[in-house]
Amino acid sequence: MKPSYFSTIDSASIKMMDCDSKVGVLATEDERGYPHLSFISSIQALNEQALTFGQFSAGLSKRLILDHPRVGFLVLSADKRYLSGNATYTHSANTGKEFDLYNNKPLFRYNSYMGFYRIFYLNLERISALKPLPMGAIIVGAILSRVKALFVKKSEKGALPFVGQSLFSQLDSLKFLCYYDASGEAVLLPVVQATSAGSDRIALSGIPFGRALKQIPDGAKVSILCLNLKMESVLVKGLYSDGVLEIERVYNSMPPKMEYVYPRSETISPVRDF
């Protein structure tokens, strides 16, 4: 069953997105056609047909959105309700009403070290209704994913560092999956049940969201963002088949240095002359 989408944001969703204590995920397209997922807690509704988010660090997504303006998004509230949708980037600004509103938020108002220095504006394409996370099913799915991981475990390339494997294996860490459907739209799903299966794979059961996961074609380019309550995060990208992601790239999405850690973008040569 495909999710139902709407062309405007209802009042309940606007109120939820206006809250600062939420998790926001933005999906842009990278240079290889993979979804690139970023933690964007500042995303909120400007009105019924537009969204905004603020920038306070120079991550890759803010550059990618200029080349590929069509994006996906998912927002998860503190009371475990979520929505998702798609939008198109239109412009950005470093002055104006929204700029002042963002920087007057309690977290940033008296913060002289870090503030929003650019606001991004997006036109809404579609948005889902607010839905509760099925916590009971997630617990069952997490157990089944860990059993599955025992049978598909692979650690030949050493793609995902040990700290990333530990982050994925935490039962309370959040995970979000994204792929592009047949029409080229980014589809985001919460996949809290996912876990690491060695350093080279991520395993997830079909509970919950089994029908939605079955819509992902074998061999599709898929990305999964994992983060915990300490805001530690890692992004993996790879090819998906039957509930297993074969990791091709690993991106450190935490400041201060956000970069690919597998394969490494730079080589370190040993010092031989003293």
Please annotate each region the language model reported.
Residues M1-F274:
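Binding-site signature for planar aromatic cofactors or substrates
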